[in-house]
Amino acid sequence: LKLGRRKRRRARERTADQISGGWDEFVDRVVDLGAPVPPRGTRRSGALAVEDHFAVVPGTGEMTESASGGAAIALADRADAEVFGPGDPSAEDVEAFWHDVDASATELASTQSKWRQLRARVSPRSLRRKERK
């Protein structure tokens, strides 16, 4: 199911929609890792929720610098610029964005235990989220 959703997002007709799909993919991956990203709101507010979630040291509740290092905010801002900016993003822009989505989500997953990573792969949390169109 998740792979099919990913393929549909990447295959959307408009490149701006493919960028939006990349952001949705990032959000779904971090939601499956346990990040409490609100289903409604701006990309930036979602990115801030991701940053906050990954800034908590597991098992201690202490705050530290986010494992994302600001990547979630950078992705959100970039998605907004590509989607709402003048003209449509190029195919190269889309490829670069999806590459960064995958790299950022993989980096965040690497901060979690192997057990948590496995649970995220099979988690239905992201499948229950309302898809943005």
Question: Whereabouts are the PLM-identified features?
Answer:
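Terminal, regulation- and interaction-focused segments at domain boundaries
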Residues: 9-13
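Membrane-proximal, non-transmembrane interaction modules
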Residues: 14-133
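Alpha-helical transmembrane segments
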Residues: 1-6
